[in-house]
Amino acid sequence: MARRRKGRVIHGVILLDKPTGISSNDALQKVKRLYGAEKAGHTGALDPLATGMLPICLGEATKFSQFLLDSDKRYRVIAKLGERTDTSDSDGQVVQTRPVHVDYDTLLACIAKFRGETDQVPSMFSALKYQGRPLYEYARQGIEVPREARKITVYEIELHRFEGDEVEMEVHCSKGTYIRTIVDDLGEMLGCGAHVTMLRRVGVANYPYERMVTLEQLNALVEQAHRDEKAVADVLDPLLLPMDTAVEALPEVNVIPELMTLIQHGQAVQVSGAPSDGMVRITGGEQKLFLGVGEIDDNGKVAPKRLVVYGE
C-alpha cells in the first residue's frame, strides 16, 4: 500500500521577509502550512531579532538549499554604542555601560579593519549546534561550551549613518558571518562597547530584494482565495521562483535530449563545451529543463550529483 502524502507536491523557492520576534524554523513551518507543501526547508537561520530575506525551498528545491547556505549574504545593521549586552543584541541583558567618545574618522578607521578574511569565534547565542543542541540553549543556562574560530570574509562594510550613539552599516559577507560578533568587536575596538538593535538581511546570493513577501501578505492572499472560492495554489504558486535559481551561480551545461535519460539515471556523460572541473548546473534540451547539479569527473565527463525528480 502506497504511503499517503502529508502535503502537496510543489517545487520552488519563496523569498520570505521574516518578521522580528520569531525563529527561522517557526517562519518555515508557517510557510509550509500555507502552501500545504510536503517538503520545505530554509537556507540559513536568522536570529529571532532579525528580519529580512529568508529563502525557503519547497519540494525538490530542498535538494539545493546547501548552495544558498554557502552563498554570500548582505545585512543592514544598526548598533547602539555605549552598552554591551550578554547576547550582543537588544534581546540580552546589559552587562557593561561606558561613555561614548568616538569621532567619525576613528569610527571609519575601525570599521575598515573588518574588511577581508579573518577568524571569527561564533557567539554562544547562535544556532550552531554542540552535541546536538543549539549553542543558545547552553547560553540561556549560563553554560559556555568550546567553539572553534571559523574563517569568514567581509567583502564590504559601509558606514551609512553615525548619529549620537547610533551607527548604521551595511555588510556584504561570506556564509557563517555573525554580524552581532562584528558589532561587539567594533564596540570593544572603540572602547565603549556596542550591541545590535536592528538587523535586517537584505540579500542572499543574487536574489532580488523586491521579490520578498511577508507572512501577512501570504495570509491575506490565502484569505482572499477562500473568499473568492479559489484554490490557494492559484494565488501562492505564482510567487515561487524556479528551483534552479538556488544554483544559478554555477556554470550551465546543456545536454541534448539523447543524453538526458542517461543523466537522469545517474550516468556520467561527455558534453562538449563543459568546464574542465568543478560543479555545474545541468539543463536538458532546447527548453533547458533543469535536471540538477553535477560535477566534472576525472575523465572530463559531467557526473550527476543531485537530480530533480519531476512528477508524483
From Swiss-Prot:
GO terms for biological process: mRNA pseudouridine synthesis; tRNA modification; tRNA pseudouridine synthesis. SUPFAM superfamilies: Pseudouridine synthase, PUA domain-like. The active site is at D47 (nucleophile). Gene3D superfamilies: Pseudouridine synthase, PUA domain. It catalyses: uridine(55) in tRNA = pseudouridine(55) in tRNA. Its EC number is 5.4.99.25. GO terms for molecular function: pseudouridine synthase activity; RNA binding; tRNA pseudouridine(55) synthase activity. Pfam families: TruB-C_2 (PF09157), TruB_C_2 (PF16198), TruB_N (PF01509). Keywords: Isomerase, tRNA processing. Responsible for synthesis of pseudouridine from uracil-55 in the psi GC loop of transfer RNAs. Belongs to the pseudouridine synthase TruB family. Type 1 subfamily. This is tRNA pseudouridine synthase B. It comes from Vibrio cholerae serotype O1 (strain ATCC 39315 / El Tor Inaba N16961).
